[in-house]
Amino acid sequence: MLHPRARTMLLLSLPAVAIGIASSLILIVVMKIASVLQNLLWLRLPGTLGIAQDSPFWIIAILTLTGIAVGLVIRFSQGHAGPDPACEPLIGAPVPPSALPGLIVALILGLAGGVSLGPEHPIMTVNIALAVAIGARLLPRVNRMEWTILASAGTIGALFGTPVAAALIFSQTLNGSSEVPLWDRLFAPLMAAAAGALTTGLFFHPHFSLPIAHYGQMEMTDILSGAIVAAIAIAAGMIAVWCLPRLHAMMHQIKNPVLMLGVGGFILGILGVIAGPVSLFKGLDEMQQMVANQAFSTSDYFLLAVIKLAALVVAAASGFRGGRIFPAVFVGVALGLMLHEHVPAVPAAITVSCAILGIVLVVTRDGWLSLFMAAVVVPNTTLLPLLCIVMLPAWLLLAGKPMMMVNRPKQQPPHDNV
């Protein structure tokens, strides 16, 4: 016979697995549609028209039209494509299901059109809303928070292809009774995360790791170097934190979302022309291209880091539906490669991983997620103790500092209301 604690844990196991699988399938379908549309917009269509896909005209035109298209969706869809992600944390309150079709369309258009945002926030919003709406109907005795946690865990597992990230994140956020062991509370979320990760793995494998030279033995000077790199990344990130609410307020002076996002798309196009196609899109595939390109110099990496960070701020401030974590990782990689090129004595494994740790910490203010992203992009067990030590001064630097999020105005513009 199972102990009552075990029966309690098993109670949500089946819903957790179902939510994890569904979370992954929604992500896969959205990413597949976005990939097909991206191929049409950036390969087939310019080839048919006899235009180079990396020509300034095409980059500016596609991003401007993408902004206009997303603006039309936000303006006219029911629920106005959900809340503005710039005003929301990664895991937020459930939105009405009526807003989800518009949100999914806006996300697909942004991903395919080259906007410098990732899928994580909208996918999280969609999965939470569906889990709460369906779960409340099927099992009304389970509260909304439980469904939110399961959907969040399933989505995190699906996004990163492993339940480890969910375990790390929820180990610090599940504040239950002290009489209930932590792993009892983690059981169902980890089931959801594992189901999401395994389902994603059946269709594709998220490829985060970079081919960076292996890091051997840790030395004391490496800790100092890593702390300096993380501090530089934090400084760069805090500039973006300062800019985001100000640019957001400026952009939202334009009351028409079609015009506002059209202007935002045009600015993104200009930034894309300056730094090239590798600075477009969510950043994961592009950072692989950046590392593989041996022709990039210190100034090239610096330009890519600055432009990608600027594009992230512009996209978020303009109201595009997307997340900030994936493009932030790209910024960290570019910054780390730049610092390694500038000071070759510091191994690239240290500069890249510590830069990712610093910039993701600014964006998420989540120590475990920052450590996880740094560790999966530069997978080297020798780095783990160094990253844990470097996290300490980085966390001190950010204590009490504002987050990369816009305070929600008392009365949002009509197109952002749900």
Swiss-Prot record:
User: Keywords assigned by UniProt?
Assistant: Cell membrane, Ion channel, Ion transport, Membrane, Transmembrane, Transmembrane helix, Transport
Could you say which residues form the signal peptide?
none
Q: Which residues cross the membrane?
A: 10-30, 54-74, 99-119, 120-140, 149-169, 186-206, 223-243, 258-278, 300-320, 322-342, 343-363, 371-391
Show the SUPFAM superfamilies listed in the entry: Clc chloride channel
Gene Ontology cellular component annotations, sorted alphabetically: plasma membrane
Offer one Pfam family short name for this entry: Voltage_CLC
Q: Where in the cell is it found?
A: Cell membrane
User: GO MF annotations for this entry?
Assistant: chloride transmembrane transporter activity; monoatomic ion channel activity
**PANTHER family linked to this entry:** CHLORIDE CHANNEL PROTEIN CLC-E (PTHR43427), ION-TRANSPORT PROTEIN YFEO-RELATED (PTHR43427:SF9)
Q: Which family does it belong to?
A: Belongs to the chloride channel (TC 2.A.49) family.
Name recorded for this polypeptide: Putative ion-transport protein YfeO
Organism field: Escherichia coli O7:K1 (strain IAI39 / ExPEC)
Gene coding for it? yfeO
